[in-house]
């Protein structure tokens, strides 16, 4: 058989070999096509098409050196053939000879309108950092008649991200999904939509905070649940749900919510709140661990220091407590609201007075309680003011302050009891008796009634009760963070970048930019935006394997510190 085949091959003409070679080429049987073209060229080597077809078959066999030799032969015979130049450009591209490839492909693109050609020119332009040119080629590739080159459109979308043009990138990716719903850009589009929904939720979150302040806790819960329906990863919504559960003394539920916040965003603020809740659940060790974790994540977290100060105060470890109150007073609190700053300073100064025995701290605390009363005519703040006067031995002003508290909340038992103690110490025994009698009419509790009856018996016998007003440090209101809009955006900027999502980070940074006025910070924002553009491009290249650049993370952290934002 081999002998017969050899004889048969010798009898074949040039035309026979070309016909057979063309058949194999059309069928994609490139190795056979190469054999036949070589046989044909042995008989006649002056037809440039044969050399071109041989080069084409070798190209598909990834034999690029031989393919280059063949296409060079074709070009020797027909140097102006644009299709030969096109194939030579492709071969150089595969050989990694980018400059030569660009030269021939660019020349070919003047006459050949081919989606693959434009896409490769786009790829080469990207390699040399000519992104505007690359975008032009990718869009040409996609917009070719009957083109379905979604890959080119995807690459165009990535360059839009590199330019920081989120809207055009979103439109490009959406167009891809209309034709291929399972395309890898689906994750990117979902990310963009989720971020926009989260940003739009700020007004709802702010309304929820207002409701908490106004003690409309159920209304606030509804708001935060609404936000979670829109953005299931709204860590801040779970934080406020935890706060509400803590206010209602449902500490296990509060712990569940704050753990959910932490699972979404490993944030110092949330560990401080977890410490508060664990302490109220009786887990002192767990609380200390949570507070220390908060401080490790952010050494400027006043809530963590305050939680530790209160914990050690109630344990009777006054030196430790005093040191942590110092930390609160030393911490720069720019991000916090005026109300939060005043409350933390107020209780910390009272704490310093009671852990050191230095009365001057009470005097310093007075200006903060006055500020709080000006912000909100609350019975709590009038009560604290009365307590401070009481500790300073000023029973007259303590009486006036407690009376002001009762004008806001006439049936508050703690205030009535404190008022009675002040009256007794002022020598106004009959008025103290009247006040205790009033308490009996309000409270319907056998144990409490017996306690008051014993006090009344002593007072009527003109015997001292030796009662003291308990420290306000045993009745701290639930503390929680109320971020302004800039810090809300800033914390989310950090969250998204820390969670390897530069697109979300870039969108939040764009919103922060409109609230920045300082030139120094504006320059930093511009620098980070530029780096995030590159990170977005890299993210689209890697998707699931992407990891945020540590240097960009550190720069974002520095920006947050300059903005006074607490993580």
From Swiss-Prot:
Signal peptide: none annotated. The keyword Repeat applies. SUPFAM superfamilies: TPR-like (SSF48452). InterPro entries: TPR-like_helical_dom_sf, TPR_rpt. TPR repeats lie at residues 14-47, 48-81, 83-115, 116-148, 150-183, 199-234, 236-268, 269-301, 303-335, 344-379, 380-412, 414-446, 505-538. Keywords: Repeat, TPR repeat. PANTHER family: CELL DIVISION CYCLE 16,23,27, CELL DIVISION CYCLE PROTEIN 27 HOMOLOG. This is TPR repeat-containing protein MJ1428.
